[in-house]
Amino acid sequence: MKIFFAILLILAVCSMAIWTVNGTPFAIKCATNADCSRKCPGNPPCRNGFCACT
């Protein structure tokens, strides 16, 4: 049982690390570039109605 929980913990940490590297795990809708600058770090542009930080 300890091995099972260890594997779950490793998977959770890895998934959080991937989300951190790639930005948010969900799409952020926007109308202008200013919307993205408030919602995402690094002031990404708004492309096709979604922020480029995703």
From Swiss-Prot:
SUPFAM superfamilies: Scorpion toxin-like. Residues 1-23 form the signal peptide. Keywords: Calcium-activated potassium channel impairing toxin, Disulfide bond, Ion channel impairing toxin, Neurotoxin, Potassium channel impairing toxin, Secreted, Signal, Toxin. GO terms for cellular component: extracellular region. Disulfide bonds join C30-C46, C36-C51, C40-C53. Expressed by the venom gland. InterPro entries: Scorpion_toxin-like_sf. GO terms for molecular function: potassium channel regulator activity; toxin activity. The keyword Transcription does not apply. The keyword Ligase does not apply. It is found in: Secreted. Belongs to the short scorpion toxin superfamily. Potassium channel inhibitor family. Alpha-KTx 14 subfamily. Selectively and reversibly inhibits small conductance calcium-activated potassium channels (KCNN, SK). Negative results: has no effect on sodium, calcium, Kv nor BK currents. Does not affect apamin binding. Has the structural arrangement of an alpha-helix connected to antiparallel beta-sheets by disulfide bonds (CS-alpha/beta). This is Potassium channel toxin alpha-KTx 14.4. It comes from Olivierus martensii.
